[in-house]
C-alpha cells in the first residue's frame, strides 16, 4: 500500500465565534430505545436525518449506539470527556462514501451503562463491548476509528482480535508497545507524581473537580485545542495548565454549539465518575497486559495528530518510529495549528483522509 499520505498539513488558525456558548438550558430527555432500521431525530442526533439510535446488550452492559449509512462497517470509539456525538461529521462523510458508520457511547459515558467499579474499564472490558456489539449486529468484522481513550481501546482491540478488526484509523493517541515499566511508575521514580495529569484524573476527588459540566466541558475543549495560547495551553506535566480550567470566553467556531450543549447536558446528568474510571483502570491494566508485551499491530493503520496537542509531550513520535509497533502503518499526518480535538478542529482533513483510508482497506 502507498504511504504518500504522510506529511504535515497546515490548518488556518480558527476564529472565535461571536455566538457565546449558552451553558444553561434544559437537560436532554431519556434516551430512546429504537429498533434498528427506524429513523430517528432525537436529542442525541441533533436532528440529523438518516441517523438511527438503539441500545444493545453486550458484555454485561447496555451500549447506546448511533448509526448512519449502509455498507462495510466502520466502528467509532470516542474518548474523554465525550460521547458518540463527537463523530457526527465523520459519520456523515463515511456514510456518504458508502459505509455503515456505527458509534457507541463508550461504557461510562452518555446513555450507555456506567459501572461504578474502576476495574471494569480496562481494554479487556471495552474490547469485549466492541466484539459483543459486532456480534449483536451480526457483523463479522469492522474497521476501527478512535480518538483519545477511544484510540487507546481501538489499538488494543486490534491487538487482541485481529480476526474481527481489520484496519485501524486513530487520532491523537499513538500505539506504544508495552514496555517493562508503566508510565505511572516512571513518573513516581522521576519525582513527577504531583505533576503528571493522570494521577490527578485518577483521584477520588476528580469526580467533584469535573462535576460542573457547563464549565469543565467547554474548558477542556478550549485548553486542549490549538486555539489556546501556546504558553497557557494544556500540559500533561503542569497542574497550573490543567484540562478543567474555565474557558476564557466564547469557544472557537470549530466547537459547534449543538455538540457542546449535548455533551454538557449528558455529563451534567450522569456525572464524570464513569468516564474518569478509564484513568483509574490504566495502571492496573499495565500489569494485566503482560501477555501482549512485544506484540505489534499488523493491520493496515493510519494516524493523525495535532502539532499543538499537549500529548505530544508524552509521545514525541514520528510516523517512522510508530512503525516499530505498527509495521503496517500506511502513513500519518501532523496538523499545524491543531490541538487534541482533531476531528473538530480539522474535520475536512480528517474526513478526506478517513474516506481515502477506507477505500484503500475495504472498498465499497
What positions do the PLM features span?
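N-terminal secretory signal peptides
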Residues: 1-16
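N-terminal export leaders
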Residues: 16-25
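Boundary at the C-terminal end of the N-terminal hydrophobic targeting segment
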Residues: 38-40
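Flexible "cap/lid" subdomain of the alpha/beta-hydrolase fold that forms the substrate-access gate
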Residues: 49-51, 60, 109-145, 149-330
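A short loop-to-beta-strand scaffold at the N-terminal edge of the catalytic core in hydrolase folds
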Residues: 58-67
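Conserved HGGG/HGGXW glycine-rich cap/lid loop of the alpha/beta-hydrolase fold
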Residues: 67-111
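Conserved Rossmann-like nucleotide-binding pocket used by diverse enzymes
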Residues: 76, 102, 145, 169, ...
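Catalytic active-site module of serine/aspartate enzymes centered on a nucleophile-bearing elbow/loop
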Residues: 329-364
Amino acid at each position: 500500500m502507498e504511504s504518500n499520505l504522510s506529511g504535515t498539513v497546515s490548518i488556518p488558525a480558527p476564529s472565535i465565534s461571536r455566538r457565546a456558548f449558552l451553558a444553561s438550558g434544559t437537560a436532554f430527555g431519556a434516551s430512546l430505545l429504537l429498533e434498528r432500521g427506524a429513523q430517528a431525530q432525537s436529542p442525541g442526533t441533533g436532528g440529523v436525518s438518516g441517523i438511527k439510535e438503539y441500545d444493545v446488550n453486550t458484555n454485561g452492559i447496555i451500549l447506546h449506539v448511533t448509526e448512519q449509512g449502509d455498507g462495510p462497517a466502520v466502528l467509532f470509539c470516542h474518548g474523554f470527556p465525550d460521547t458518540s456525538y463527537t463523530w457526527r461529521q465523520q459519520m456523515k462523510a463515511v456514510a456518504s462514501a458508502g459505509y455503515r458508520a456505527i458509534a457507541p457511547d463508550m461504557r461510562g459515558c452518555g446513555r450507555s451503562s456506567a459501572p461504578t467499579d474502576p476495574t471494569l474499564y480496562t481494554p479487556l472490558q471495552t474490547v469485549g463491548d466492541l466484539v459483543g456489539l459486532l456480534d449483536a449486529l451480526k457483523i463479522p468484522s469492522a474497521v476501527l476509528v478512535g480518538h483519545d481513550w477511544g484510540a487507546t481501546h481501538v489499538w488494543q482491540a486490534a491487538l487482541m482480535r485481529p480476526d474481527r478488526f481489520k484496519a485501524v484509523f486513530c487520532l491523537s493517541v499513538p500505539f506504544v508497545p508495552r514496555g517493562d515499566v508503566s508510565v505511572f511508575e516512571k513518573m513516581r521514580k522521576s519525582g513527577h507524581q504531583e505533576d503528571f495529569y493522570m494521577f490527578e484524573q485518577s483521584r477520588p476527588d476528580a469526580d467533584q473537580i469535573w462535576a460542573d459540566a457547563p464549565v469543565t466541558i467547554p474548558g477542556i475543549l478550549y485548553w486542549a485545542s490549538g486555539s489556546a495560547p501556546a504558553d497557557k495551553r494544556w500540559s500533561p506535566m503542569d497542574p497550573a495548565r490543567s484540562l478543567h480550567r474555565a474557558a476564557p470566553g466564547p469557544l472557537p467556531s470549530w466547537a459547534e454549539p449543538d455538540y457542546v450543549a449535548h455533551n454538557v447536558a449528558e455529563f451534567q446528568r450522569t456525572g464524570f465518575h464513569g468516564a474518569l474510571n478509564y484513568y483509574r483502570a490504566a495502571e492496573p491494566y499495565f500489569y494485566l497486559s503482560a501477555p501482549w508485551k512485544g506484540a505489534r499491530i499488523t493491520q493496515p493503520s493510519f494516524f493523525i495528530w495535532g502539532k499543538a496537542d499537549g500529548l505530544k509531550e508524552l509521545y514525541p513520535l514520528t510516523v517512522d518510529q510508530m512503525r516499530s509497533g505498527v509495521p503496517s502503518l500506511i502513513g500519518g499526518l501532523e496538523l499545524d495549528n491543531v490541538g487534541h480535538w482533531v476531528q473538530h478542529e480539522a474535520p475536512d482533513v480528517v474526513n478526506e483522509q478517513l474516506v481515502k483510508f477506507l477505500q484503500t482497506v475495504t472498498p465499497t
